[in-house]
Amino acid sequence: AVSWIRIALFGAPFILVTLAGNGWMRGVQETARPLRYVLLGNGLSAVLCPLLVYPAGLGLEGSAIANVVAQVVSASLFFRALFAEDVALRPVPALLRAQLGLGRDLIVRSLAFQACFVSAASVAARTSIAAVGAHQVVLQLWTFLALVLDSLAIAAQAIVGAALGAGEQAKARRFAWQITGYGLVFGVGLGLVFAAVAGVLPKVFTTDPGVLAEIPHAWWFFVALQPVAGVVFALDGVLLGAGDAAFLRTATLLSAGVGFLPMIWLSLAFGWGLVGIWTGLTLFMLLRLVTLVLRTRSEHWSVVGATR
């Protein structure tokens, strides 16, 4: 593991370039090119990884090298696209300060997410081996569907940001509720699909009877939360597009501190197991839902102009 990390760290700067490039292109409503760039890099990694691990005999280090090569390729494509724009590359201090402020709020928000999910994994691990296995199966599906639903958030960021930047406040508000409706419908659809495969899909991940017995304790929370997640992720995108990161930071901290974290540790104290952990996640999502809906109903988020 240590040797893998040492090699993989060389890819960290290129990952940051790729993330920045994705943000830039999404911000100007260009979604096809970043998809191609990332797919090309990941496709190359998928080809190189088995070749370097097995025929080349590099083992775990081979997979790290494949990842770094993919990250370099993706970052290079974004650099090439940037240079083709023929724009000045000289830093603008005022813009950097604004971005650092926005980044600070988003970093704090991300840390709150990580504190919650690390705590949940810790409590699941202390419950039983079967419980932590079941938790990880359902959590991986939750993360996968979060990325699927996040496609709405990406669209919302681009369109709301463009509308407010052009001074079209009414258009931004109208789209906010439109994308919320799409998120709700999408979430309901995903919930129904995963409710239908509840007896089949977990067996794809494990055949362990103990883990399979624990999975239903989290599964139905996961299914029921999909409509909530659809709305929450859509409104996340709306407010991010409006540059309302400070509110998102505060709402996430409040939801984590009042809902998720207390319930997780109460679950450990009283032996509630996965039911307690996923009740905590449910409270977290419901609190986020309430705060985001109230914020979007207000007029405070829809500030027109190039900057807030």
Regions inferred by a protein language model and the residue ranges of each:
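Helix-terminus/linker motif at the lipid-water interface of multi-pass membrane proteins
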Residues: L51-L58, L111-F144, A162, V200-P209
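Short alpha-helical transmembrane segments in multi-pass integral membrane proteins
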Residues: A1-P13, L44-V47, L51-I107, V160-L225, ...
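Structural motif
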Residues: R26, V53-P55, P91, A124-T127, ...
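C-terminal structured "cap/appendage" subdomains that terminate the fold
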Residues: L235-L239, G243-G257, I264-W272, G276
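Small-residue-rich hydrophobic transmembrane alpha-helices
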Residues: I15-P34, V132-V197, V232-G243, F247
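Hydrophobic alpha-helical membrane segments of integral membrane proteins
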Residues: R33-Y37, G62-A66, T250-A251, T279
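Hydrophobic alpha-helical transmembrane bundles that constitute the permease/transmembrane domains
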Residues: A12-A20, W24, V28, L39-V47, ...
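Short loop-to-helix capping motifs
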Residues: E30-T31, G59, S128-I129, D208, ...
